[in-house]
Amino acid sequence: MNVAITGITGMVGSHLIKRLVEENKTGEALNIRALIRESSLVDHLKAFEDVDYVMGGLEDKESLTRLVEGMDVVFHLAHYPGPVQTADELVKVNVNGTFDLLEACRKARIKQFVFMSACTVFGQVLPTVDADHPLDESHPVMPGSLYGAIKSSIESFCFFYQRSRAFDITLIRPVTIYGVKPQIDKSEWFNTIDYLATNYNVDLKGSTKYVSVDSVTQALEKVMGNADCSGKIYHLIDGHIHNLDLGQMIVDTIDSFGEIEGVKGEEGVPMSNQAARELGVEFSGREGIVEYIKLVHKLQTTYGGDRILDQW
């Protein structure tokens, strides 16, 4: 199977390439091509010598054509970052760039396009959603942020190409993803773990819906080349945690003398992950968070101020 990936230098892309190359549970040989920017940090990708790297970006049509030529499946994980860029730049690169990518895929006659969207497409939630009727993939999309609007726009273009019979599409919508990033100090909850590891007191507010990067890459692998996933959307959510409770988990896990202060956040909108579970995606619950805290603490202890890992 020939597979192309955008966003390989990000957290999800980095973990996906490890899963596909080092584990490869598909049962068939994979030929992987990936799009990278010249300015991207790539030390963590040195181990994957068989990957065919294409230099370019979403704003470079020629590189998109080279990326998808001869490919069967395209994973679109890249998102041009904010908030330092203007809204005009973010829309131009992400929406227009993805349209160019989709058009290149049509011309290349790929078989499947997998887009990593986000649950931020739900800015407004219907009053019918409650614990007995959690928000699922059938809920209407009404973005309340620029990021959500960009993701929603791209989803619409994906369905346009599917319904015009250009290729199959599958959408993945994760909530906040935790996992080790190649630049580890950018990893989710890194600073809180770091402060408590040095016995500082921290003030925490709010709450978070979470899912591990392992569950996300499981989902991506399971939908890859899977005809049953054509036209489907999958919500990836493991659970909801108050940041005060998360802080206490960190204290208990790393034996910190730091103290936690603050107030609990809202309970959050109930969300369903039933479709992902039926796909076979496994979720590790709070035990997964504990293991992640241990791993980040170990990396902090091992690498100190050297926050970029070439082997991770």
What is each residue range found by the language model?
Residues 50-51, 55-93, 104:
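NAD(P)H-binding glycine-rich loop region in Rossmannoid oxidoreductase-like domains
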Residues 286-312:
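Amphipathic terminal alpha-helices
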Residues 1-26:
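N-terminal Rossmann NAD(P)H-binding glycine-rich loop of SDR-like oxidoreductase domains
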Residues 207, 219-268, 272, 304-311:
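Mid/C-terminal beta-alpha module of Rossmann-like enzyme folds, strongest
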Residues 59, 89-100, 141, 145, ...:
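Glycine-rich NAD(P)-binding loop of the Rossmann-fold in SDR/ketoreductase-type enzymes
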Residues 159-208, 213:
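NAD(P)-dependent short-chain dehydrogenase/reductase
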Residues 142-170:
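Active-site Tyr-X1-5-Lys
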Residues 100-146:
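Conserved Rossmann-fold NAD(P)-dependent oxidoreductase catalytic core, especially the SDR/UDP-sugar
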